[in-house]
Amino acid sequence: MNAFTLYPAIDMRNGKCVRLIQGDYGKETIYGDSPLDMAAQFAQEGAEWIHLVDLDGAKAGRKVNDRHVLDIARQLDAKVEIGGGIRSEADVYGYLSQGVDRVILGSSAVSDPAFVKSMLKQYGGKIAIGLDARNGYVSTEGWLETSSVRAADLGRELAAEGAETFIFTDIATDGMLSGPNIESTVQLAKATGKTVIASGGVSSVADLKALARFKDAGVSGAIIGKALYTKQFTLAEALSGVKDA
């Protein structure tokens, strides 16, 4: 039986742990001064994975908070995945060769598909594809741009090129604590035939259990952000809730 994996999220901006609402850089709340301390706390509570986002990097198109990422990867036993501003093979190799377990490529899947396909060929399962969608269409550049590419179509294309893991974010629900978009997440898993990690909108352990019901359809886990920071539930409660799901 496949386990349903939880990914506590740390979004980094100016070296701090923050949350944005629907990706709006003007709607920021700071939750901590040290990404490493936050990650250590999640690991202590039982996290097997930590999901890191370099928000400055996503906006700038280059790595910005990489020092914090590598500190976490080197000092903690939990596995680490990172997205945001990764646009070159040097970036990908730099992270993977220094302890990061998985690199998430998002905007470049639309803007530079040849690069993404080449990275999939070279690094396989160590690359995850981040598909952030607004009304079914992929958004790029830290969600500042919406493309004319449908998430399901891009997912299918990249699955054929070797993508094994997708991270699907429904922007409308992100940071809103309004419940995840289960339907679109399951649709992407079915369209690609691969595993999809759900992101955005989780507000309760019940939401996580609802997602976990679809793990046999390919929904392999969920990223949790704001719900943990606003203490809707603890990570320990969440892990216990999905253990038998």
Curated annotation (Swiss-Prot):
Full protein name: 1-(5-phosphoribosyl)-5-[(5-phosphoribosylamino)methylideneamino] imidazole-4-carboxamide isomerase
Sorted UniProt keywords: Amino-acid biosynthesis, Cytoplasm, Histidine biosynthesis, Isomerase
GO molecular function: 1-(5-phosphoribosyl)-5-[(5-phosphoribosylamino)methylideneamino]imidazole-4-carboxamide isomerase activity
A Pfam family recorded for this sequence: His_biosynth
Subcellular compartments: Cytoplasm
Coiled coil: none
Residues in the signal sequence: none
CC terms in the record's Gene Ontology section: cytoplasm
Principal localisation: cytoplasm
Catalytic residue list: 11 (proton acceptor), 132 (proton donor)
Enzyme class: isomerase
Catalysed reaction equations from the record: 1-(5-phospho-beta-D-ribosyl)-5-[(5-phospho-beta-D-ribosylamino)methylideneamino]imidazole-4-carboxamide = 5-[(5-phospho-1-deoxy-D-ribulos-1-ylimino)methylamino]-1-(5-phospho-beta-D-ribosyl)imidazole-4-carboxamide
Organism: Bacillus velezensis (strain DSM 23117 / BGSC 10A6 / LMG 26770 / FZB42)
Highest taxon of the lineage: Bacteria
CDD domains: HisA
